Design a protein with these regions (language model features):
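Conserved SAM-binding loop
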Residues: 87, 538, 563
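Generic hydrophobic alpha-helical segments
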Residues: 98, 182-185, 489-493, 570, ...
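A structural micro-motif
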Residues: 246-249, 534, 561
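Short acidic-hydrophobic, aromatic-tinged amphipathic segments that line or gate anion-handling sites
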Residues: 557-573
């Protein structure tokens, strides 16, 4: 029976949980630092406010869901995360996932999936797997991020153009898929509202141009204020523009931190929610750790990946308890925090508290904001997410990277994010395995030295005084010996060793890794040669392959006398074996004469 030391595992897991807030307070916290954090927190709150509302509505949810997430998850990420300056909350990357889960499983399913994702993140952090998410290939990340950006932008066409899709939908819900939405928008195009188009253009112009005026006040806040006033003026003239209040009438009564009423928890299928929850966890982990790495470069410190994942997990467990949605670290808000003087998690906590005050006391005024304005704000976010310059750079990369990126992009747009990440990672892994297998080779050094093969001679075999004796063949192996290269390795040896030498030296100084499949191929080579009277000698075996050979018993089968650290010793062993074989043959020839 396996004995597991759960106390040790628990102690190790808790040792990985070292929130940055605790470390900052232990180092000492001054009023000067608090003042700097307070200013940064206020500015970041101004940036986060319109985004929290816009992202929530873009996902098909009321604005209080996004605000609750910005408050609860934003506070938890700062309090329990492993990055000093991380700002958390709802992000545009989650819009696609949230929309799909909400459409299929309802609000209860979305809350359950968010909490499940939080548990997954906590487990990953406690198990010390904070770095495993970093192994997702870069082309996969660029591909699905660009795909999400395109879907987000497409989802804002209704708001940007002020379309009335009710006739085209005929009482049904808006399709969750990309092509389905475009079809509905195309049929609804005659209902375009030119006043909404004007507000959308004004929003885009203000958000883009305001940066030239000042970066202390977010352009999105200015756009919301100005376009809301414009919409009120148009309404007084009899021109109607859809607002948050007209789509979500309950907002006029104010916002609260509470679970939505009327949810059927008994209908939640937790097994069916595992895959969506995994998508949330992966995306939250990727986004938060990427944001933390960017923050490290800006402040000259290093974050704790495991603690950051635990903090993200806690935030996603708490967020749905107050009516929130999935959350993660936000790169743009984190950068804004740093640029405005935020240096400790207190800035993130204050940003959440400022948003809470706005939510409780000014939330009812969100009903006046035009939907076209939010569409413009989200469209800007989608453009920034797309990072087309990275896509252009990858298109000039290897064909394998381009294939992985395009696969992730197309699957994100046409299928869903879960399939895109899984397929992208698998495709990247298979292509990497193929490249690694192609780079592994076994070269016949004997033929090369004799001038029968082209190529560079191994450095020390051409030295004076080192001569490969007749009846010996030497093969030099380059690269990793693993399942992707095992057959190629075996076929090369067996096809080139056509003369059946008496001694076959396998030089393995450039083989740093050996797996079970490659070891099995090596066993087959040994069996093939041994059955034909050929002795296999190994030279320069590195640590990991040698350890595997010892554990598997392969070293005992070929004999430890036939394993040497240097090629000179291996050649000396070959001479010894050849001399022994020669003397044995001579005695065998004399024996019949003596018998007569």
């Amino acid at each position: 029976m396996l004995n597991v030391n759960w106390k040790l595992i628990g102690k190790t897991g808790l040792d990985r949980f070292r929130p940055a807030l605790w470390e900052c307070l232990r180092e000492g916290y001054s009023w000067k630092t608090f003042a700097s954090d307070a200013v940064a927190g206020l500015i970041v709150a101004a940036v986060a406010l319109p985004l929290a509302i816009a992202f929530s509505i873009a996902a098909g949810l009321p604005p209080q869901a996004g605000m609750a997430t910005a408050v609860v998850a934003g506070l938890a990420i700062s309090a329990f995360g492993g990055c000093r300056v991380q700002i958390g909350g709802p992000t545009g990357a989650f819009i696609v996932i949230i929309y799909g889960i909400y459409a299929q499983f309802g609000m209860a399913g979305l809350m359950a999936a968010t909490a499940m994702a939080g548990v997954m993140l906590v487990v990953l952090g406690l198990c010390g797997l904070g770095s495993i998410i970093k192994y997702i290939p870069y082309p996969v990340t660029v591909g699905f991020t660009s795909g999400i950006a395109l879907i987000i932008f497409a989802g804002q066409i209704e708001a940007l153009l002020g379309l009335d899709c009710s006739t085209a939908l005929a009482g049904a819900k808006m399709p969750g898929d990309f092509l389905g939405k475009l079809a509905i928008y195309a049929r609804s195009f005659p209902t375009i509202n030119w006043a909404a188009v004007g507000i959308s253009i004004a929003t885009l112009a203000i958000c883009i141009g305001w940066k030239r005026v000042t970066q202390r006040v977010p352009g999105s806040i200015v756009a919301i204020v100005m376009t809301t006033l414009a919409a009120m003026a148009l309404r007084s003239l009899g021109v109607e523009v859809e607002t948050i209040g007209s789509r979500f009438p309950e907002v006029a009564g104010g916002m609260t931190l509470a679970l939505p009423k009327g949810m059927d928890w008994g209908a939640v299928d937790f097994r069916a929610l595992f895959s969506p929850a995994l998508s949330i966890a992966l995306l939250a982990g990727i986004e938060s750790l990427l944001s933390a790495v960017v923050a490290d470069g800006m402040i000259g410190r290093r974050h704790n990946s495991n603690t950051e994942l635990i903090g993200q997990g806690i935030a996603n467990i708490l967020s749905p308890l107050f009516g929130g949605i999935p959350a993660t670290g936000a790169i743009a808000r984190t950068a804004t925090n740093i640029k405005n003087g935020g240096r400790t998690p207190v800035a993130g906590i204050l940003h959440a508290l400022f948003l809470l005050l706005v939510m409780l006391f000014l939330g009812r005024y969100a009903a006046l904001i035009p939907m076209a304005t939010l569409g413009g704000v989200v469209a800007i976010v989608a453009y920034n997410m797309s990072e087309w310059h990275l896509v252009k750079g990858l298109l000039r990369s290897t064909r394998s990277d381009v294939l992985v990126m395009l696969t992730s992009f197309l699957l994100t747009v046409l299928v869903d994010l879960t399939v895109a990440i899984q397929a992208g990672v698998l495709l990247a892994a298979f292509l990497f395995i193929r490249r690694m297998g192609e780079s592994t080779e076994a070269r016949d050094v004997t033929r090369l030295l004799a001038g029968h093969d082209e190529g560079r001679r191994p450095d020390d075999l051409g030295q004076p005084g080192i001569v490969i004796p007749e009846g010996t063949e030497v093969f030099e192996v380059y690269g990793a010996l693993f399942f992707g290269a095992a057959d190629k390795f075996k076929d090369t040896l067996l096809s080139h060793a056509h003369k059946l030498p008496r001694v076959l030296i396998l030089r393995m100084r450039h083989v740093l890794m050996l797996d079970a499949t490659a070891l099995h191929s090596l066993e087959e080579v040994y069996a093939h040669t041994h059955a034909r009277g050929v002795t296999l000698v190994l030279s320069g075996v590195t640590a990991q392959p040698l350890m595997l050979m010892v554990r598997s018993g392969f070293l005992d089968r070929i004999g430890q006398d036939n394993v040497h650290s240097h090629i000179i010793d291996a050649i000396a062993r070959a001479r010894q074996l050849l001399a022994t074989t020669t003397s044995t043959d001579k005695r065998a020839q004399r024996t019949p004469k003596e018998a007569r």
